Structures are given as structure tokens and as C-alpha cells.
């Protein structure tokens, strides 16, 4: 069973590759939260996976919230792993996730990171990758995920996460500030280029966008995944002045 969260599609692509190879069921975390489905029954030979993007050098708050409520019936120390997608590095994501899992009495046997195209654009200096780098990351991700699949099939116990520089500062100091101050949807708006196509509404993984007339309106249950911004065909979705002249990215697969 593979639990996953994805906004712009990088982690969804990874989760799909793992599900096909491991023949494990996929569970989209926002759907489980919406339906309040927190209890899952495990086979004795089940592989349990968590797949998610890195948000400010840690797992997204929505993933940690789900784990707190999750109940795994029939858990007998089955092989449990995680795979995270990141634009550059993961910080102390492994520590954060292992702590959340240990509070449930679950052991994490393996963890991996996959470098994927950047999509965070809400801070100065942050933008999507240039097209050449984007294409290289997507190409390199294929053999990386193949290797991860092979390790999972062998139930290997190993952690291959690229922590990067100053991981403590990034995860323990910057991430809490991100969760406190950068999760608000209040600055989202659409320019006159909006054509009312509803793609932003349909792409929101938590159903936080409603169309009022022909314009999207954001609620307060935002994960800051930026799917709405990146999926807009008119580049009409903006976030204050922070997204001016910045690019868009949505996983092509």
C-alpha cells in the first residue's frame, strides 16, 4: 500500500511507478482525509510506502497530519519506506518522518530522494528550472526510480536522501517559519487573463478553490502546493507580487 501526496505531479509520477512495479494499491492522502478513511488492513507481505514532495526541507504538513490519524491494522513490522521528491535537497526530512512513524510504533526501513524539477516560486530567488535543467532532471529521475524500485523489491534497509548543506537550519528553523507564514492563500488572485476554465479548481488536491461566477476564490485550507498557479493555461493565477515574471511547471507525465 502506497500513500502519496502530490500537487504539481512529480510525486504522483513516482508513486505510480512504484505502484506498478510493487503491485501495491495507491492511496491519495487528500482523498483519504476528505473521506475520513484512516484505517487500512495490511497483508503479512505488504510493503508500506509514503511518497511526497519536500516542502521547505520537510514532509508537507498534510502528510504528517495524515500519519497522526492513520491506523494500520495487522501491522507486524512489514517493510515500510518513503520516497520524497525534491528540487535540490531534503534537509532532515528522514528524521522528521521517522519520528512521526515511531510515535505510531512503526519502523521505517528505507528512504530515498528523487531530484525533480523545481516548482516553488513564492519567495525571492525561487523560480522554476530552466527548460534544459527541467528536462535533464526528468530524464535522470527514470533510472533513479528504477533503482529505488529494485531496492524496495529486495526489501533493502538503506537511506539515500540528499540532505544538502546546513540541514538543521533548513528543517528545524526555516521549515517551522514556512509552515507558519507561507501557507496562507490570501495573496492568490487572478488577472484579467483568466478565462474561467476551472483548471485551477480541478487541480487543487484539497478542494480549496471554488468558482464564483467565472473567477476562482480561494478558501483557507491551502497546502501551498501551487498546483493552481502552475496549471493555469493563461498564467493568470498570481500570488501578490511574488510570482511576477516567474515560470510555470507541471509534471508532463
Task: Give residue spans per PLM region.
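Active-site-proximal loop/hinge segments that shape catalytic or ion-binding/gating pockets
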Residues: 249-252
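Generic structural motif recognizing short loop/turn segments at the entrances and edges of beta-strands
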Residues: 22-23, 184-186, 214
